Amino acid sequence: MPHTLPDISQCIRQNLEQYFKDLNGTEPCGVYDMVLHQVEKPLLVCVMEQCGGNQSKASVMLGLNRNTLRKKLIQHGLL
């Protein structure tokens, strides 16, 4: 049987469920931004590696404007 990667959305869901359990009843705040920030950085790292650091290629792969990509790379400390 071939090895299959878990669905990304399922991985996120499982981690969020664990996050809420770990809060132990404490009311969360800013979950949306937290999740986007946590997902965006590894996405950027992986795509930049796949593109050999070429921001123009990475922006096309991501469907982002090159300046938007550059801004995000700076925000995540990747430049």
UniProtKB/Swiss-Prot annotation:
SUPFAM superfamilies: Homeodomain-like. PANTHER family: DNA-BINDING PROTEIN FIS. Belongs to the transcriptional regulatory Fis family. Signal peptide: none annotated. This is Putative Fis-like DNA-binding protein. NCBIfam families: PRK01905.1. InterPro entries: Fis_DNA-bd (IPR005412), Homeodomain-like_sf (IPR009057), HTH_Fis (IPR002197), Trans_regulatory_Fis (IPR050207). One of its GO terms (molecular function) is sequence-specific DNA binding. Gene3D superfamilies: Homeodomain-like. Keywords: DNA-binding. One of its GO terms (biological process) is regulation of DNA-templated transcription. Residues 55-74 bind DNA.
